[in-house]
């Protein structure tokens, strides 16, 4: 264990279903967004008080099934969400109104991502397609050739403007890298032995990490198109996210939240909250979503007990 431990700060209560995704904003560090199986997105105002870390400032309603993913535009003005109702929605965060509905997927949309310049949107679905959209809600490209043969569980744009790629993963156990300029497949990454739930791209766009059923987190070199190394997560990996400012990777697994130091390939910390009311059959709540604050000092984690929990790095 490294000296950077994490300290629990508190939890945010408001959702009535699993907290499925979390989005933080560099432009507005006092705001975070969470998506949930209660069909809503909550805009939280962070107060960081002793007794309460934040409160629901606004609730975005409109989806009529689970909300699976949410992202914020880089100016902090808009949010984009995906849902099992087969649609995406673009929201004006100042008014809470839906400004666009994106219709085209024929099954649950599981993942959504904004390009670095916020001009393009990518979505992945249980209909086994990846769609590229503009902000007007027009589908500009439908990736079907060489696409996943099973559900597309996660899609992410590289944050690196000079290397515009999309990384996707699916239940076909493949991580795919797509060249945005030509909408063409660049690399297939094989190695996982079970379905893949999540993929994350490092802040500089050089690495991708993937994880899922086999409990192994695999790291891929996006420039060279090769497997770098694997980290043992020890349980099903639900979500992965790179730290914005440290060489860390955070993994939400079925049993705990693990933070890996990628330099030493060691575990920085392992987070297991103290759950007050353990659910049916004594199953502990699982962490299914994670996000770092833009400055990398705060970790937000969403759980199947409908709670959002917050930790701070105490370096």
Swiss-Prot record:
Please verify whether the record's keywords include Thylakoid: no
Q: What happens when the gene is disrupted?
A: Lowers the growth rate and completely impairs fruiting body formation. Lowers transcriptional levels of genes encoding adenylate cyclase and protein kinase A catalytic subunit. Also weakens transcriptional responses to sexual development induction by some genes related to fruiting body development, including 4 jacalin-related lectin encoding genes, 4 hydrophobin encoding genes, and 3 functionally-unknown genes.
Q: What are the entry keywords?
A: Conidiation, Repeat, Ribonucleoprotein, Ribosomal protein, Sporulation, WD repeat
Pfam families documented for this protein: WD40 (PF00400)
Note the segments forming the WD repeats: 14-54, 62-101, 104-144, 147-188, 191-230, 232-270, 282-315
Please provide, alphabetically and separated by semicolons, the GO molecular function terms listed in this UniProt record: ribosome binding; translation regulator activity
Superkingdom, natural source: Eukaryota
- State the InterPro entries in the record: G-protein_beta_WD-40_rep, RACK1-like, WD40/YVTN_repeat-like_dom_sf, WD40_repeat_CS, WD40_repeat_dom_sf, WD40_rpt
PROSITE patterns with a match to the protein in the record: WD_REPEATS_1, WD_REPEATS_2, WD_REPEATS_REGION
The keyword Ubl conjugation is annotated on this UniProt entry: no
Q: Which PANTHER family match?
A: RECEPTOR FOR ACTIVATED PROTEIN KINASE C RACK1
What is the protein's known function? Answer: Component of the ribosome, a large ribonucleoprotein complex responsible for the synthesis of proteins in the cell. The small ribosomal subunit (SSU) binds messenger RNAs (mRNAs) and translates the encoded message by selecting cognate aminoacyl-transfer RNA (tRNA) molecules. The large subunit (LSU) contains the ribosomal catalytic site termed the peptidyl transferase center (PTC), which catalyzes the formation of peptide bonds, thereby polymerizing the amino acids delivered by tRNAs into a polypeptide chain.
Family, as annotated: Belongs to the WD repeat G protein beta family. Ribosomal protein RACK1 subfamily.
Name of the protein described by the UniProt record: Cross-pathway control WD-repeat protein 2
């Amino acid at each position: 264990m490294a000296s950077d431990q994490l300290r629990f700060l508190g939890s945010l209560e408001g959702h009535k279903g699993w907290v499925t995704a979390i989005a933080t904003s560099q432009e507005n560090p006092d705001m975070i967004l969470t998506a949930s199986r209660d069909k809503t997105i909550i805009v939280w105002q962070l107060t960081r008080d002793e007794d309460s870390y934040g409160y629901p400032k606004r609730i975005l309603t409109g989806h009529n099934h689970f909300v699976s993913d949410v992202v914020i535009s880089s100016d902090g003005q808009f949010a984009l969400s995906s849902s099992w109702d087969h649609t995406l929605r673009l929201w004006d965060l100042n008014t809470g109104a839906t400004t666009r509905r994106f219709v085209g997927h024929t099954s649950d949309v599981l993942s959504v991502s904004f390009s670095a310049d916020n001009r393009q949107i990518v979505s992945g679905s249980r209909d086994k397609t990846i769609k590229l959209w503009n902000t007007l809600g027009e589908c500009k490209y439908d990736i079907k050739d060489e696409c996943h043969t099973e559900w597309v569980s996660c899609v992410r744009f590289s944050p690196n403007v000079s290397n515009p790629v999309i990384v996707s993963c699916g239940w076909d156990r493949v991580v795919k890298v797509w060249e945005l300029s030509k909408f063409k497949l660049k690399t297939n990454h094989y190695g996982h032995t079970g379905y893949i739930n999540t993929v994350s791209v490092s802040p500089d766009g050089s690495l991708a990490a993937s994880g899922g059923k086999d409990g192994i987190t695999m790291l891929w070199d996006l420039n060279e198109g090769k497997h770098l190394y694997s980290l043992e997560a020890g349980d099903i990996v639900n979500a992965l996210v790179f730290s914005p400012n440290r060489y860390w990777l955070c993994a939400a697994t079925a049993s705990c939240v693990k933070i890996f130091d990628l330099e030493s390939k060691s575990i920085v910390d392992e987070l297991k909250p103290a759950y007050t009311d353990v659910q049916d059959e004594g199953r502990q709540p699982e962490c299914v979503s994670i996000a770092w604050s833009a400055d990398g000092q705060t970790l937000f984690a969403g759980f199947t007990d409908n709670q959002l929990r917050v930790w701070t790095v105490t370096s």
